[in-house]
A protein has these predicted regions:
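Core alpha/beta nucleotide-donor-binding catalytic domains of modification enzymes
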Residues: 2-116, 126-129, 134-137
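Class I S-adenosyl-L-methionine
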Residues: 70-78, 87-205
């Protein structure tokens, strides 16, 4: 089995039915894909029409097209995940942080408060841990007041079976039963991922 077949098999959505996962700022459903592969039911929230359409096409779960904020009414769910807009904290987005109108954390915190999940997680750029660390600590403090144990860690994609150097900060809130995955020693190369495609002859004429 080559890498592409392995990934397609691993991430193939499974019919589960429960528990429910709310996927905020869902994009095309990259985070939800992993949860559906483990049998979870997902419900995405995304303001971009094309992203929502892609979500519905590739996943079993529905996607609600909406621009969410702290006043949005969310349903109860066992899990909440999301990728709050990272432009406020990324180098490419000029790192305006909490002064940026694109900040999605008020909506994410509101969803946690309403849904009361057993566990939640969000991913973001490493800039949130450094230049905007005070804001991260404020977010953590607010979520800890809701009774969650909050842990965060920088994870490098290439150490988890992905042929890409991509570092992201993963933040998890739980009730006492969670461990970050152990990094893999063996790395997947671009050649492994592309398979026979990597050996095709480039024709210029």
């Amino acid at each position: 089995m080559n890498y592409i077949e392995k990934i397609n098999n691993l991430l193939k959505p499974k019919q589960g039915g429960s528990p429910l996962v709310l996927d905020l700022f869902a994009g095309c459903g990259g985070l939800a894909l992993g949860f559906e592969a483990q049998g979870f039911e997902t419900l995405g929230f995304e303001m971009d029409n094309d992203c929502c359409a892609t979500y519905k096409k590739n996943l079993n779960g529905d996607c609600i097209q909406a621009k969410i904020d702290s006043s949005y009414q969310f349903p109860r769910a066992q899990v909440v995940i999301g990728g709050p807009p990272c432009q406020p904290f990324s180098v490419g987005g000029h790192q305006r942080g909490v002064r940026d109108a694109r900040d999605g954390f008020p909506a994410f915190i509101s969803a946690i408060e309403q849904a009361k999940p057993e566990i939640w997680m969000f991913e973001n750029v490493r800039g949130l841990m450094y230049k905007n660390k005070n804001y991260l600590e404020a977010i953590v403090a607010e979520l800890e007041e809701m009774g969650y144990i909050v842990e965060y860690k920088l994870l490098q994609a290439v150490q988890y079976g992905i042929p890409q150097n991509r570092e992201r900060m993963i933040v998890v809130g739980h009730r006492g039963k969670f461990e970050f995955p152990v990094a893999q020693k063996k790395k997947v190369t671009a050649g492994d991922a592309l398979g026979d495609i990597a050996h095709l002859i480039h024709i210029t004429e």
